[in-house]
């Protein structure tokens, strides 16, 4: 097992990208890395499968960020809720972009 990259979640934890060898990769939180059940099934597989998943979820993050920014702009009382959601999506997007870059090499 080789940890290829670590990225902060923005909530005190880390995302990790792991190469288990034999063309098997996974990404998720540190908790997934140490969990008996391992990584979620949609976050592991061949290099190509994990890369495709990172790219797919990146698109969703971008859509969510746009949607949350619009909701935040409409809100009269600027609560921290939308800001927190935007920050979380941005951190996840950064992680997915970095992991996709690494997997593309």
Where are these regions (language model features)?
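Negatively charged, low-complexity tracts enriched in Asp/Glu with abundant Ser/Thr
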Residues: 1-10
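Polar/charged side chains located within well-ordered beta-strands of beta-rich proteins
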Residues: 6, 61, 89-92
């Amino acid at each position: 097992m080789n940890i290829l990259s670590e990225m902060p979640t923005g909530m005190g934890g880390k995302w990790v990208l792991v190469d288990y060898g034999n063309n098997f990769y996974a990404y998720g939180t540190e908790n997934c890395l140490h969990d008996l059940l391992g990584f979620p099934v949609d976050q592991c597989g061949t290099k190509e499968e994990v890369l495709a998943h990172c790219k797919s979820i990146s698109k969703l993050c971008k859509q969510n960020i746009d949607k949350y920014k619009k909701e935040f702009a409409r809100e009269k009382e600027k609560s921290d809720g939308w800001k927190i959601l935007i920050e979380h999506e941005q951190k996840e997007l950064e992680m997915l972009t970095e992991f996709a870059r690494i997997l593309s090499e």
